[in-house]
């Protein structure tokens, strides 16, 4: 229940997939192993995005508890593994910016289906101001690189609202964000 401070009301990450043959979505299943509050806070699980890997595995990432989480399904979304924290998100996903009500640093995932590399970008206040970060996995999400500062600003500016895509022919990674 959105906005509820009742401990019985919890946020979860759910998954459903579209079937072309039946022209319908599957019944949604909960894929997050933990739950968050419903206050639209850093303790709320939200901002889920997904990507399909080289071998058909499905990856889902989301934010919550000042962390970036991932889960993976290797059977088309029927079953999911154990949630894994792949990065800490100091300050959480909801960042206060000058002249903006709130800036989000939600994670986005994309898969290079040729090289079998998964990339995740997000924004946080790791350096004291909002920056955009990238990590990647070359082993189907089992281990992740160190965080890379994409925005590389030299002033006290803020970068946020990131998103990414991959050129599946060249393998180039493109990240767009507000600055």
Annotate each predicted stretch with a short phrase.
Residues 1-179:
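Extracellular, repeat-based ectodomains that mediate carbohydrate processing or recognition
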């Amino acid at each position: 229940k959105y906005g509820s401070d009742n401990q019985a009301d919890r946020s979860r990450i759910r998954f459903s997939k579209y079937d072309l043959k039946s022209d319908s979505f599957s019944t949604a299943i909960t894929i997050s192993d933990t739950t968050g509050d419903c206050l639209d806070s850093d303790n709320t699980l939200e901002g889920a995005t997904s990507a399909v890997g080289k071998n058909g595995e499905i990856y889902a990432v989301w934010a919550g508890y000042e962390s970036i989480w991932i889960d993976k399904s290797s059977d088309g979304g029927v079953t999911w593994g154990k949630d894994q924290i792949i990065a800490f998100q100091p300050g959480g996903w909801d960042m206060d910016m000058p002249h903006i009500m709130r800036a989000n640093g939600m994670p986005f995932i994309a898969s290079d289906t040729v090289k079998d590399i998964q990339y995740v970008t997000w924004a946080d206040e790791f350096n004291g101001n909002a920056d955009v970060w990238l990590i990647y996995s070359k082993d189907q999400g089992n281990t992740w690189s160190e965080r890379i500062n994409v925005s590389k600003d030299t002033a006290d500016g803020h970068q946020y609202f990131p998103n990414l895509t991959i050129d599946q022919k060249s393998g180039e990674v493109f990240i767009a964000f507000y600055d």
